[in-house]
């Protein structure tokens, strides 16, 4: 498995595809670059999803998130991109991606992107 930042999200078969369950992850070291100022933006990315047939492999997720480190992107765009890329890789029953960005200019920004319907009881 690679050790450099990569947009290649690896997956593995859901070990319990017949049972709806939630997977939650928190990635507190996310960074990207503000496209307006060129300054770094720091965020905690929170993922919650109910898998269907595939689950995301954690090291590939870490390397995927690292791949944004030098990319100029708006908070709204990168949060939605992460959600879209995870949907493409996993085809989950439901997913929520929250980008909780550090204060910049006195403003704290939280962006939430969702896909699918959350199964009842999960």
Curated annotation (Swiss-Prot):
Residue positions annotated to bind substrate are: 56-58, 75-76
Where, per UniProt, does this protein localize?
Answer: Cytoplasm
Any one cellular-component term (Gene Ontology): cytoplasm
Locate the transmembrane regions by residue number.
none
Q: Which UniProt keywords apply?
A: Cytoplasm, NADP, Oxidoreductase, Queuosine biosynthesis
InterPro entries per the UniProt record, alphabetical? GTP-CH-I_C/QueF, NADPH_dep_7-cyano-7-deazaG_red, QueF, QueF_type1
Pathway recorded for this protein: tRNA modification; tRNA-queuosine biosynthesis
Q: What is its EC number?
A: 1.7.1.13
Q: Broadest EC class?
A: oxidoreductase
Any single GO molecular-function term of the entry would be: preQ1 synthase activity
Catalysed reactions listed for this entry: 7-aminomethyl-7-carbaguanine + 2 NADP(+) = 7-cyano-7-deazaguanine + 2 NADPH + 3 H(+)
Q: GO BP, one example?
A: tRNA modification
The active site lies at 34 (thioimide intermediate), 41 (proton donor)
Q: Which family does it belong to?
A: Belongs to the GTP cyclohydrolase I family. QueF type 1 subfamily.
**Function, as annotated:** Catalyzes the NADPH-dependent reduction of 7-cyano-7-deazaguanine (preQ0) to 7-aminomethyl-7-deazaguanine (preQ1).
Record's PANTHER family?
NADPH-DEPENDENT 7-CYANO-7-DEAZAGUANINE REDUCTASE (PTHR34354:SF1)
What is the protein name stated in its UniProt record?
NADPH-dependent 7-cyano-7-deazaguanine reductase
Q: Which organism is it from?
A: Anaeromyxobacter dehalogenans (strain 2CP-C)
Q: Which gene encodes it?
A: queF
């Amino acid at each position: 498995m690679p050790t450099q930042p990569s947009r290649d999200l690896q997956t593995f078969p859901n070990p319990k595809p017949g049972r709806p369950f939630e997977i939650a992850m928190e990635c507190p070291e996310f960074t990207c670059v503000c496209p307006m100022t060129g300054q770094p933006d720091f965020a905690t990315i929170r993922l919650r999803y109910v898998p269907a047939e595939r689950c995301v492999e954690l090291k590939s997720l870490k390397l995927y998130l690292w791949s944004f480190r030098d990319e100029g992107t708006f908070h709204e765009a990168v949060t939605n991109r992460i959600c879209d890329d995870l949907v493409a890789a996993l085809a989950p029953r439901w997913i929520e991606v929250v980008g909780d960005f550090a204060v910049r200019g006195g403003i704290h920004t939280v962006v939430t992107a969702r896909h699918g319907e959350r199964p009842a009881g999960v």
